[in-house]
């Protein structure tokens, strides 16, 4: 068997392996890999072009240049295989051994490996307990180090300069102490370390360590020492005596024409090392002066550094053309490195690419393939068939036939192509629907024909897009292409489970036109409309001109019942709708009523969804194809077009403009009178124009959508309303007003563009609008890259999340509620629980009966039923609470959104989640400029209106009446809830502090009625009691300044952040309320009436003034608003996934309790939250400039903000736990996407958040070997604790930690995956010192080592393999029990 292997040139290594380990190589290991030492820097002889002996390409070491031929030509042919030529010393074998044989260089002096020296934290420095700076001084021959002081007063490892050394030697004598320099000295220190003893000493020290810094230092070194012990490596191996040389074929030297050579940079770097090494050997032999030898050693160290990682230390070594040479590290690093360029991104053979054109006559599963392309792609198949049928005798003959394009070739091509799917791909492939399989149809011409309905999935249009065609060769590949990738099997979008095979543009317009109803007949009673019995009659009437498509008629429609019986009924409809109704499959859940309405794009999507859910895939594919045909035909017949007059400018536009201009003037006047500040005026002006713009737009929409009898429907309105093309915002700019524009800085220019494109812009307006337009284009270019990078990070963090088991058996879950925003339901309960598994029985609130049992999947019918019954919240299983060891279980994941069925085991849900989140990011960023940078900013919310009719309940009510008698909200968490007649809560609104309440408890309100209003631009400070104001610590010119407004000449008193004086007089600006007797008033909660003022507060009362309860004492202005578009959105999503701390973040209370203000620090205020029951105090330090949103004496609950601002996810996790964190992250991320109208299912975000919560921080080590503060993987943590409990020891305690996606990717268990992501050198250095083992569980590491991925069909293969291996083992054990255990393993 071995001989056969030799002939085939295969090595005898194991073909299968289950894990890969990385370690630091010992010098012995490096020598054992090597086939000989390289002694000379020569490469090849310039005359003979043969490799030089003992040089970098030596054939004696690395193997022959030609197969089975030695260098001197004495032995040729296969029969001399394995002989070593006695003349030239070359083994006669395959030339490809030059790709796998290594050599080595014996160094004259040891050198440090730069990765272990410079990759932070420096491993060598940690081991020898020196700073990196000092260590470098020793290694690069600047300072000596005392290795053993003997009896002198020198310290061990003390650094000495050359002069110091001579002085000390004079003092203590030459042999009075031992000093060294360079890598030799460091190596002797490392060799002298007894790892086991060190560990014991450090563990003892750690128990006694008090200071945090000392602990950290000890822990760092202890971990490193333990890593060395566990991996069985020695620290001195980080210093090298031998340098390995990689095989010559991996650093080739290729002759160019003209007698020059192109070479890999590595050869230069190796040459440099060899030259310096040989020179050093010679100098040592010659007994050269110490200083020369030292210099040569330093140069050797630098050349080895450059070989391993050029540019890591000092200046990079450059080649002839001033460009830095590519070292071994650079070969691995970055986009062009080995990992990303060759292992993860391989190129494909058997592919072609061409421009795409539309193919409306294709079926959904077909694509048109140009004959020329097909001939080229299917060549091998054609050759085989030609030979098989005896049409060609040899492959050569077949080749000639194909080249001549003989007629029989085309017949054979037809036969080969039949039912052989091809893959079509459009770059950029943002999600898995960017590659789909189709059956090719041969066409003339040179362009690929694409089915119009799949354009959405590919994000393709026909303005010159190109697509690539790939041919799956093996029968397995064809099978997978057909079953998994066929376009007919990908009807639903994996991101949200909605159909993605939806009509767009002309098809939508055609169907919309077809389902219109003529306004003339709207008034006609249904009974009077003509009655038709069959479709034939209707068609006859249409052809004869008796009926128009849009006339109202009554028609007989067949209705199918659940038991299969059919009845007919008469329904009012139009001939057009009847035509669409004819296409519907016959099913009781797909009634004619679905299409008996005006069909917009969304409605058409709903129809397709219903057909898919109830009638299955085949029916829906046929339905979609027929619908497309009908849509195209009708759109062509209708001949819809629009002219200038279709853009109607509303008559009331000019009135609205005048009214707003008057408002703006009024604000100017108020500002000049000093009633409002400049910032408030700006905000109010912007608001007024925003409102005006909306009103003009509404007027224009009313005008355009008016349907006058006898007049055709406005075409622009039809296009926009149907969803075919154009949005209301675009129409607003054409016929309303362009509105507000943003400056390049992001602020809004307060003079809006009053004209629209139909009227034309003035020069000034045109100039103002150029900012926005240009910003849009610049954004697009930048954001595409950002979005791609976000997707890459998401894929990397989630790639090893795979469905591994059917059920993990957990009882835990998340509680789902409808998401409300300003009283509107933005995401209903039924949407959120659809396709999830119930964690506990869902009960009917009326009678307590079970609607859905625990661990059952909630389907469409169930979810609608639950919502109708008014269930508040449902507890569902979630991947966040799944207890599967690796990956997640099918029950916790729920429904596979792309199939509408429970998810299969082996589905790569992590990658799907990453693609679903990343794909819209790219699309959205490309979409910003369509609105031309018009500032889209709604008016700031300044009131709440009832969204339903109902009765009012006010929660946390704390109200005072102000001097005008209006009730003012004094509570910081007041909410107004609306209940319907049955007492169920329909909406809930948050009312801010200082708002005016316009309704009272139990009052009945109607929809649209205002409930409360407030000033959105300032935060007021309001008094609860009447009394006299007294200023405290408000000193003119110190904490209080009078600001004079340049424009109005009015002054206002503003509190400023004062610089602390040296005397340290602690000033805390505040207002105190006193009664007539001068006593300080008490508030309702018993605290004294003191109001602390933060900087920038504007005082509204004078010192000594008398105030009424509910009056405003001071206002804090909020900053002006910036434009909101996804540009703010994409970085926001990245910020959330990276778990960054937002700037000016909120500070939240970690316990319940009362607020007190402690003594201030220099630049911080101290807030103390004191719990009344336990008496424990928690202290928070807040920068002075921040506005504290609580007053002294307020009672706060755990999680309430003490300082306003965006919340920090880490705080939420620490204070409120995993469920609150997941809810926060999901809602925040969904908000960004919702703003753009993108639907993503929650479970995708949950999958990524699960990956971010993989690590646990140890708080209590118990009897484990863990250290406090160490980050441990959740799985390892649980396993270790189980082991400890079984042994009867104390388990470790820990808290979950939230990591950003980049950090989580780099901390993953697989070092191969982490290295291919980012910071390759750091990851590999860390893995090598720890001797890490990669279990090859994720997708990425398996792709890199070239195996099938353990997901999908690959997961089945790996399962079968492990079962078979186990069976083999047990069989072997049974048959040959006497054999030693070693053979059992090799039986694998």
UniProtKB/Swiss-Prot annotation:
Listed cofactors: Mg(2+); Zn(2+)
GO molecular function, one term: magnesium ion binding
Task performed by this protein: DNA-dependent RNA polymerase catalyzes the transcription of DNA into RNA using the four ribonucleoside triphosphates as substrates.
GO BP terms: DNA-templated transcription
Positions contributing to Zn(2+) 2 binding: 808, 882, 889, 892
Complex and partners: The RNAP catalytic core consists of 2 alpha, 1 beta, 1 beta' and 1 omega subunit. When a sigma factor is associated with the core the holoenzyme is formed, which can initiate transcription.
Cofactor annotation comment: Binds 1 Mg(2+) ion per subunit.
Binding-site residues for Zn(2+) 1, renumbered to this chain: 70, 72, 85, 88
EC number: 2.7.7.6
HAMAP family xrefs: RNApol_bact_RpoC (MF_01322)
Gene3D superfamilies: 1.10.132.30, 1.10.150.390, 1.10.1790.20, 1.10.40.90, 2.40.40.20, 2.40.50.100, RNA polymerase II, clamp domain (4.10.860.120), RNA polymerase Rpb1, domain 3 (1.10.274.100)
One Pfam family linked to the record: RNA_pol_Rpb1_3
Organism superkingdom: Bacteria
Reaction(s) catalysed (UniProt annotation): RNA(n) + a ribonucleoside 5'-triphosphate = RNA(n+1) + diphosphate
List of residues binding Mg(2+): 461, 463, 465
Keyword Transferase: yes
Keywords, alphabetical: DNA-directed RNA polymerase, Magnesium, Metal-binding, Nucleotidyltransferase, Transcription, Transferase, Zinc
Gene: rpoC
Main EC class the enzyme belongs to: transferase
Cellular component terms per the entry's GO annotation: DNA-directed RNA polymerase complex
Protein name: DNA-directed RNA polymerase subunit beta'
Family according to the record: Belongs to the RNA polymerase beta' chain family.
């Amino acid at each position: 068997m071995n001989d056969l292997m030799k002939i085939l040139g295969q090595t005898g290594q194991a073909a299968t392996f289950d894990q890969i380990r990385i370690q630091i190589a010992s010098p012995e290991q490096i020598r054992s890999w090597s086939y000989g030492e390289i002694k000379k820097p020569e490469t090849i002889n310039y005359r003979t072009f043969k490799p030089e002996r003992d040089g970098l390409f030596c054939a004696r070491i690395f193997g022959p240049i030609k197969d089975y031929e030695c260098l001197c030509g004495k032995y040729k042919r296969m029969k001399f295989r394995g002989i070593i030529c006695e003349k030239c010393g070359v083994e006669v074998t395959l030339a490809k051994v030059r790709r796998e044989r290594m050599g080595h260089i014996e160094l004259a002096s040891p050198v440090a490996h730069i990765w272990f020296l410079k990759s932070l934290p420096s491993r060598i420095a940690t081991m020898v307990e020196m700073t990196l700076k000092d260590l470098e001084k020793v290694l690069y021959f600047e300072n000596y180090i005392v290795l053993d002081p003997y009896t002198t007063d020198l310290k061990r490892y003390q650094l000495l300069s050359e002069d110091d050394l001579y002085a000390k030697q004079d003092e203590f004598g030459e042999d009075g102490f031992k000093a060294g320099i360079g890598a030799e000295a460091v190596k002797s220190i490392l060799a002298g370390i007894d790892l086991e003893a060190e560990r014991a000493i450090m563990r003892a020290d750690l128990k006694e360590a008090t200071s945090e810094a000392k602990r950290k230092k000890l822990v760092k070194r202890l971990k490193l020492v333990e890593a060395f012990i566990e991996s069985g490596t020695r620290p001195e191996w980080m210093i090298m005596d031998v340098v390995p040389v990689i095989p010559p074929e991996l650093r080739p030297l290729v002759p160019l024409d003209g007698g020059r050579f192109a070479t890999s940079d590595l050869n230069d770097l190796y040459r440099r090392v060899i030259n310096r090494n040989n020179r050093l050997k010679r100098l040592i032999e010659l007994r050269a002066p110490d200083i020369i030898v030292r210099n040569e050693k330093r140069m050797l160290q630098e050349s080895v550094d450059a070989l391993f990682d050029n540019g890591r230390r000092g200046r990079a070594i450059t080649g002839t053309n001033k460009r830095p040479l590519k070292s071994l590290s650079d070969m691995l690093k970055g986009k062009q490195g080995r990992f990303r360029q060759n292992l993860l991104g391989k190129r494909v053979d058997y592919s072609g690419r061409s421009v795409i054109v539309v193919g409306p006559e294709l079926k959904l599963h077909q694509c048109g393939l140009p004959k020329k392309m097909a001939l080229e792609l299917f060549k091998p198949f054609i050759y085989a068939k030609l030979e098989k049928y005896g049409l060609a005798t040899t492959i050569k003959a077949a080749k000639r036939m194909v080249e001549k394009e003989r007629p029989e070739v085309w017949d054979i091509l037809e036969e080969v192509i039949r039912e052989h799917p091809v893959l079509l791909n459009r770059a950029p492939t943002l999600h898995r629907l960017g590659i789909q399989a189709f059956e090719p149809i041969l066409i003339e011409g040179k362009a690929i024909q694409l089915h119009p309905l799949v354009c959405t999935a590919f994000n393709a249009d026909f303005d010159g897009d190109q697509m690539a065609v790939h041919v799956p060769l093996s029968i397995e590949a064809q099978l997978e292409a057909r079953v998994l990738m066929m376009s007919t099997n990908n009807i639903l979008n994996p991101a949200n489970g909605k159909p993605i095979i939806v009509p767009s543009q002309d098809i939508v317009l055609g169907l919309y036109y077809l389902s219109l109803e003529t306004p003339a007949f709207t008034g006609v009673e249904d009974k009077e409309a003509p009655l038709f019995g069959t479709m034939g009659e209707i068609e006859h009437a249409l052809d004869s001109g008796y009926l128009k498509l849009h006339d109202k008629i009554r028609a007989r429609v067949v209705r199918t019942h659940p038991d299969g019986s059919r009845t007919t009924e008469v329904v009012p409809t139009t001939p057009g709708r009847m035509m669409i109704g004819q296409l519907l499959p016959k099913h009781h859940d797909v009634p004619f009523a679905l299409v008996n309405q005006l069909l917009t794009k969304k409605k058409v999507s709903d129809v397709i969804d219903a057909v898919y859910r109830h009638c299955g895939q085949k029916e829906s594919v046929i339905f979609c194809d027929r619908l497309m045909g009908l849509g195209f035909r009708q759109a062509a017949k209708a001949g819809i077009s629009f002219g200038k007059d279709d853009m109607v400018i509303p008559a009331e536009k000019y009135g609205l403009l005048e009214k707003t201009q008057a408002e703006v003037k009024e604000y100017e006047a108020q500002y000049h009178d000093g009633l409002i500040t400049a910032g408030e005026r700006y905000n109010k002006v912007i608001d007024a124009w925003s409102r005006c713009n909306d009103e003009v737009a509404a007027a224009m929409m009313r005008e355009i959508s008016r349907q006058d009898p006898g007049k055709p429907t406005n075409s622009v309105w039809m296009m926009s309303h149907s969803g075919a093309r154009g949005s209301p915002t675009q129409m607003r700019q054409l016929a309303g007003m362009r509105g507000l524009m943003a400056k390049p800085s992001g602020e809004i220019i307060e003079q809006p563009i009053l004209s629209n494109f139909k009227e034309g812009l003035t020069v000034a307006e045109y100039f103002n609008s150029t900012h926005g337009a240009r910003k849009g284009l610049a954004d697009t270019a930048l954001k595409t890259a950002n979005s791609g990078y976000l997707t890459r990070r998401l894929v990397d963090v989630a790639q090893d999340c795979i469905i591994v088991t059917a059920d993990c058996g957990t009882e835990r879950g998340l509680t789902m509620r409808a998401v409300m925003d300003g009283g509107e339901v933005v995401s209903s309960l039924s949407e959120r629980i659809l396709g999830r598994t119930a964690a506990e029985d869902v009960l009917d609130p009326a009678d307590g009966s079970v609607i859905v049992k625990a661990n059952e999947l909630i389907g469409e019918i169930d979810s609608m039923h639950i919502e109708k019954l008014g269930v508040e919240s449902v507890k569902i299983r979630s991947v966040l609470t799944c207890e599967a060891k690796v990956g997640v279980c099918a029950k916790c994941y729920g429904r596979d959104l792309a199939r509408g069925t429970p998810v299969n085991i082996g589905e790569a849900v992590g990658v799907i989640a990453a693609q679903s989140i990343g794909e819209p990011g790219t699309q959205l960023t490309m979409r910003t400029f369509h609105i031309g940078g018009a500032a889209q900013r709604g008016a700031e919310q300044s009131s709440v209106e009832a969204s339903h009719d109902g009765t009012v309940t006010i929660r946390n009510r704390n109200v005072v009446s102000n001097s005008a008698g209006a009730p003012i909200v004094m509570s910081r968490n007041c909410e107004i809830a609306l209940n319907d007649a049955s007492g169920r809560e329909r909406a809930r609104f948050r009312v801010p502090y200082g708002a005016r309440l316009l309704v009272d408890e139990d009052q009945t309100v109607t929809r649209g009625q205002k409930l409360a209003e407030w000033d959105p631009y300032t935060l007021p400070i309001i008094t609860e009691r009447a009394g006299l104001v007294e200023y405290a610590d408000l000193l003119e010119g110190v904490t209080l300044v009078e600001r004079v407004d340049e424009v109005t000449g009015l002054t206002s008193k503003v509190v400023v952040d004062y610089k602390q004086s040296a005397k340290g007089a602690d000033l805390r600006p505040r207002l105190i309320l006193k009664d007539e007797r001068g006593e300080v008033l008490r508030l309702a909660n018993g605290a004294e009436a003191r109001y602390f003022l933060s900087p920038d507060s504007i005082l509204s009362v004078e010192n000594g003034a008398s105030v009424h309860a509910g009056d405003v004492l001071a206002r804090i202005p909020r900053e002006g608003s910036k434009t909101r578009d996804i540009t703010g959105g994409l970085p926001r999503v990245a910020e959330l996934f990276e778990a960054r701390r937002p700037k000016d973040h909120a500070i939240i209370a970690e316990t319940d309790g009362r607020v007190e203000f402690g003594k201030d620090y220099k630049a911080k205020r101290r807030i103390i939250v004191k719990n009344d029951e336990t008496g424990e105090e928690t202290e928070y330090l807040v920068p002075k400039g921040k506005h504290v949103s609580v007053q002294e004496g307020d009672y706060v609950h755990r999680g309430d903000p003490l300082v306003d601002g965006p919340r920090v996810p880490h705080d939420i996790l620490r204070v409120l736990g995993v469920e609150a964190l997941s809810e926060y992250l999901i809602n925040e991320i969904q908000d960004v996407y919702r703003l753009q109208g993108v639907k993503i299912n929650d479970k995708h975000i949950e999958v990524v958040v699960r990956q971010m919560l993989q690590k646990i921080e140890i708080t209590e080590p118990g009897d484990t070997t863990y250290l406090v503060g160490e980050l441990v993987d959740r799985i390892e943590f649980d396993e270790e604790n189980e082991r400890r409990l079984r042994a009867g020891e104390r388990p470790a305690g820990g808290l979950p930690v939230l990591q950003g996606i980049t950090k989580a990717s780099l901390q993953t268990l697989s070092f191969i995956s982490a290295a291919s992501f980012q910071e390759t050198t750091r990851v590999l250095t860390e893995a090598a010192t720890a001797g890490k083992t990669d279990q090859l569980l994720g997708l990425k590491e398996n792709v890199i080592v070239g195996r099938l991925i353990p997901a999908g069909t690959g997961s089945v293969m790996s399962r079968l393999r492990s079962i078979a291996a186990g069976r083999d083992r047990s069989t072997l054990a049974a048959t040959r029990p006497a054999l030693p255990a070693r053979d059992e393993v090799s039986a694998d």
